[in-house]
Amino acid sequence: RCKPCFTTDPQMSKKCADCCGGXKX
């Protein structure tokens, strides 16, 4: 599941992008 993508951690941001397809999410 995709969680809200708002973080300053590059590692988390990358994971988020992989999940949200751009971290918008």
Swiss-Prot record:
Cellular component, GO annotation: extracellular region
Coiled-coil annotated residue ranges, if any: none
Pfam families: Toxin_5
Major location category of this protein: secreted
Keyword annotations from UniProtKB, A to Z: Chloride channel impairing toxin, Disulfide bond, Ion channel impairing toxin, Secreted, Toxin, Voltage-gated chloride channel impairing toxin
Disulfide bonding pattern of the chain: 2-19
InterPro entries for the chain: Scorpion_toxin-like_sf, Scorpion_toxinS_Cl_inh
Source species, domain of life: Eukaryota
Cross-referenced PROSITE patterns: SHORT_SCORPION_CHLORIDE
UniProt entry tagged with the keyword Cell membrane: no
Tissue: Expressed by the venom gland.
GO terms, molecular function: chloride channel regulator activity; toxin activity
UniProt-annotated location(s): Secreted
Keyword Cell inner membrane: no
Function noted in UniProt: Toxin with unknown function in healthy organisms. On glioma cells, interacts with chloride channels (probably ClC-3/CLCN3) and MMP2 at the surface of glioma cells. This complex is then internalized via caveolae, thus inhibiting the chloride channels necessary for cell shrinkage and tumor propagation.
Family according to the record: Belongs to the short scorpion toxin superfamily. Chloride channel inhibitor family.
Protein name, UniProt field: Toxin PBITx1
